[in-house]
Amino acid sequence: MADHTTKEQKSFSFLAHSPSFDHSSLSYPLFDWEEDLLALQENSGSQAFPFTTTSLPLPDLEPLSEDVLNSYSSASWNETEQNRGDGASSEKKRENGTVKETTKKRKINERHREHSVRIISDITTYTTSSAPTTLSKETVSRYFYMPITQAAIALNVGLTLLKRRCRELGIRRWPHRKLMSLNTLISNVKELQKMEGEENAEKLQDALEMLEKEKRTIEDLPDLEFKDKTKRLRQACFKANHKRKKKRSLKSDQSQVPSCSSSGSVPSDESVDEAGMESDEEMKYLLCGFSSEFTSGL
């Protein structure tokens, strides 16, 4: 036990021989630094370097008058008001532009509407006032031998108006084709009358008078249909004319090409003559019926 204590004393014996250390310097080190700083400042203030300063002479400044201040303030106020006015004017211009565009569109629409109303009013007035007075049945019947388009031009009316007026007058179909067909039939009978001579002159004359009478009745009553005998006579005349034309063309071909008669492609003169005779006989029979009807009517 005693040995152990002696060893501990020996181990800490170096502390007794260590130099003395002043602990007062560690107690408040900040205060010492402040004192050093103050001393340095005093020394630097006492040993200040002289600086050379140069001063320029400044002009005497006069205070601004109220007029100048008012002018500056009014100018700035005017600028702000002008900017506001420019913005307002641009907005007004835009509004005016849109208003002008809308007014233009309205004017254009009104013009179109007025034009269409004027056209409709003209048509209605023309149809209601002028059509019944001028387009009578007698006036319209003068143009039956024209196609309906040419008749409308000659009457200086529209095609639709003319058709409407015809329906009002009881004319369902324009009788141009019917009357022209009768004229063709009358001309065919006249040609046959020249060819026959005095043999069947009386019968042909009776047929012509019957056809002229039927034409006048159709002029008065345009919706009247042809009689059966007139239809058959028209068909017979058409066949006879067709066969005559065929015979003429056959003769012209045979005169140009003599060898053509031997071929079977071209009909012979006898067959054409037989067909022509049949059609002529049919025409004569129908003409006899016309003459008998004419005499019985008398």
Curated annotation (Swiss-Prot):
Coiled-coil intervals: 188-222
Region (Disordered) location: 1-22, 73-112, 241-279
GO biological process: regulation of DNA-templated transcription
Subcellular locations according to the entry: Nucleus
One GO cellular component term noted in the UniProt record for this chain: nucleus
Chain intervals with Low complexity compositional bias: 252-269
Domain RWP-RK stretches: 121-203
UniProt KW keywords: Coiled coil, DNA-binding, Nucleus, Transcription, Transcription regulation
Ranges of Acidic residues composition bias in the record: 270-279
UniProt xrefs under InterPro entries: RKD-like (IPR044607), RWP-RK_dom (IPR003035)
GO molecular function: DNA binding; DNA-binding transcription factor activity
Basic and acidic residues bias spans: 1-10, 81-102
Described function: Putative transcription factor.
Protein's name in the database: Protein RKD2
Protein species of origin: Arabidopsis thaliana
Gene name as annotated: RKD2
